[in-house]
Amino acid sequence: MSTTSEIRRTFLDFFVKNGHQEVASSPLVPLNDPTLMFTNAGMVQFKNVFTGAETRPYHRATTSQKCVRAGGKHNDLDNVGYTARHHTFFEMLGNFSFGDYFKEQAIDFAWRLITEEYALPKDRLLVTVHTSDEDAAGLWRKVAGLPDERIIRIPTNDNFWAMGDTGPCGPCSEIFFDHGPKVAGGPPGSADENGDRFIEIWNLVFMQFEQLTVDQRVALPRPSIDTGMGLERVAAVLQGKHDNYDIDLMRALIEAIASAAGTDPDGPHKVSHRVIADHLRSACFLIADGVLPSNEGRGYVLRRIMRRAMRHAHMMGCVDPLMFKLVPALNREMADQFPELNRANALITETLKLEETRFKQMLDRGLKLLAEETGDLASGDSLPGPVAFKLYDTYGFPLDLTQDALRPRGIGVDTAGFDAAMARQREDARKSWTGSGDHATEAVWFDIRDRVGASEFLGYTSTDAEGAIVALVVDGKVVESAPADTEVAVIANQTPFYGESGGQMGDAGEIRLAEGGKVVVRDTAKKLGALHVHIGRVEGATIRVGQAARFVVDTERRDALRSHHSATHLLHEALRRRLGEHVTQKGSLVAPDRLRFDISHPKPLSAAEIRVVEDDVNREIRANAEITTQIMDPDSAIEAGAMALFGEKYGEEVRVVSMGRREPGANRPFSVELCGGTHARRTGDIGFFKIIGEGAVASGVRRIEAVTGQAAFEHIEAQDDLVSGAAQLLKVTPADLPGRIQALLDDRRRLERDLADARRKLATGGGGAAAPAVVEINGVKWVGRLLEDVPAKDLKGMVDEVKKQLGSGVVALIAVADGKASLVVGVTEDLVGRFDAVALVRAGAGAIGGKGGGGRPDMAQAGGPDGAQAGAALAAIEAALAG
């Protein structure tokens, strides 16, 4: 029996042997395609090749593409675990021809692979073709010798593939394996085609048309091939299994789950083992590709997947986090093919552990509410939609998790009511949102761009240039002129002013009008990716469309921005080298006085890590290496080692910024990134780099704040002033300051202990203090005492001391501080049957304005805002004892 890994390798090697380029799987976050949430097919990374928008140095390719289908059109999440073949994560084996071979060779390759390399019996194979595709039917007869009864014609779109409403498209031919008459189900196209007897293992797409409009389709001059074979499906067939979860790879994960959880993988929690095995793969690969759990977008889908798996772990009785313990098992099975799992191992492990810890807290609250709301519901009933929405909105309980939790009891969910509650909340939010006003002028920017075209940016080589005013906007409206003292947005045909984008703030400066007067520019924005919009105030004259002007950037501010931007690149690379390649940019701000950089990392940076990252950056700064830029196409840039941001859409050309030393044996300088911002000329121009802050901004996302150049110098001066000032106050040298502070802290802790001990003695009558007055009520010893300025946290210990002295009795101590009262009542063990400390403390709480009180029968506490009534509270407790 071949393993799943061997089946994958056989496929790839077969096509390499037949002239195909083996191409690595693209990330699950599609590069350069923000229209897709996740990569869901092998052809995604070749989409632009098929459309002709991109060329590759090969015309044939083969891949094993990692895919996720969970959300949107392709959503298998709800079925995972309950069926034999649904997955959120799967591998798609594929071979592709870009205008090279077509139907006959594609069919020949497919037939030879499955019958010779995989040795599947020919008499158990059948195919489908589109009704209109007689070419394919004839080729299956010619190449494979298939009789007509095993070539099934399908008239529906199941056998016709299209990239979208327009673009490349064509008929499909699917290959099916027959498990035999002992398995229920009919052939494709029959009434019972959804049975398990006939299983699709490969889909061949013949891209031979281009859809121009709904009604117009023309032949492509260079038809292409796109095929997809589900690795898990073909592995099940080759290993003699009817269920994808029984193949060796999935079984290894399921056994690891059972071992870690102490459960039977084939027992009552069989479905849960399958869910966790599938979702573990999705979660780990998504994290490795830069997605982190959050409440929106891809991060929200990841969180749903993770929490569904964690819910099933809870159902299996797992008290402690489970999923992070399974990462080594996944790495053993898949890291050889996908080394990113090893590179991101620390991030994956920490993210899973942190998310599961948080989820368990949420789950306990949510399940308690769910149990309360469904206590009277029986099988066949439905949970009201507003209740399901409350679980989601208040407790973070996704709808699918609620449905999953109720499924074993046969209880449904009113999804229409849930959707209505969601819609009401969104409408309320929309009505309460006043907005920034930008939406009111968006049409204006489109109109200007269509009329005057894009602004030409001159700022990479100049900070002072001539230009012409081509448009003016005042209060969201296009105008022909603007008088002095008017706030205005100015668009020119060309400008050296950088418009805010990529995290870098826009330039400031002046627009000096040829006819006198100027615009003091406080900021520059970039609209629609094309217009550089100078925002400022007109001074000294009227500005008019058509005027010539001189555009002068504030060079001191620009230099500070360039310094911080270049330092951000060096910081990014230093973090990846020191913390791991899982570190990716999650956000940034480049300002004149600081930089802010958000990264994917599961835990705080230690002081040692911060120091070594600073040292790495400053080492590159001291090297004073040249910072270079180069214009390249995106694929060439990435192949050359440039870092690109996941999901970022790049044009046909990108700007590659390289900086730092080229170390011996390295094929690139220290940092190489795709970037459109402005940068220093040499690393030495940055001056000095200092990290001034590090903290969390979201789960798995850390924020680093740093300064460079003059800002770094000013920060160090300020820190030096603080240290010198503190040393003067304590009358020590700066070098002796840490020791002096530690001595003061030690003295404070000692004095706090002494004070607490003195208060305790005061309450109990020790240390020369008068013994507490003991009164007997109904044969029970009673001590009630008012204490001034005693911390509430000390009262319990004092009550315990008095209880010990009494041996048997009831104690009530009230501390009054800042006008507020804190009350603690204690009852010795022998009297708990007669008196309840909770009832007694509640009797006294009312007098001091408290609401209730709580604790145990032997010790309870309460508080209230009216410390002046402390005596009345003690009297109320005495009355309760006497009653």
Swiss-Prot record:
Summarize where Zn(2+) binds, as residue positions. 565, 569, 675, 679
What's a Pfam family in this record?
DHHA1
**GO CC terms in record:** cytosol
Q: Taking the first listed entry, what is the main subcellular location of this protein, grouped into a coarse class?
A: cytoplasm
Q: Which SUPFAM superfamilies match?
A: Class II aaRS and biotin synthetases, Putative anticodon-binding domain of alanyl-tRNA synthetase (AlaRS), ThrRS/AlaRS common domain, Translation proteins
In its UniProt record, a GO molecular function of this protein is:
aminoacyl-tRNA deacylase activity
Q: Which family does it belong to?
A: Belongs to the class-II aminoacyl-tRNA synthetase family.
Q: What is recorded about the domains?
A: Consists of three domains; the N-terminal catalytic domain, the editing domain and the C-terminal C-Ala domain. The editing domain removes incorrectly charged amino acids, while the C-Ala domain, along with tRNA(Ala), serves as a bridge to cooperatively bring together the editing and aminoacylation centers thus stimulating deacylation of misacylated tRNAs.
Enumerate the PANTHER family for this protein: ALANINE--TRNA LIGASE, CYTOPLASMIC (PTHR11777:SF9), ALANYL-TRNA SYNTHETASE (PTHR11777)
Sum up the protein's function in the record's words: Catalyzes the attachment of alanine to tRNA(Ala) in a two-step reaction: alanine is first activated by ATP to form Ala-AMP and then transferred to the acceptor end of tRNA(Ala). Also edits incorrectly charged Ser-tRNA(Ala) and Gly-tRNA(Ala) via its editing domain.
Q: Report what the protein is called.
A: Alanine--tRNA ligase
Native species of this protein? Rhodospirillum rubrum (strain ATCC 11170 / ATH 1.1.1 / DSM 467 / LMG 4362 / NCIMB 8255 / S1)
- Its gene is alaS
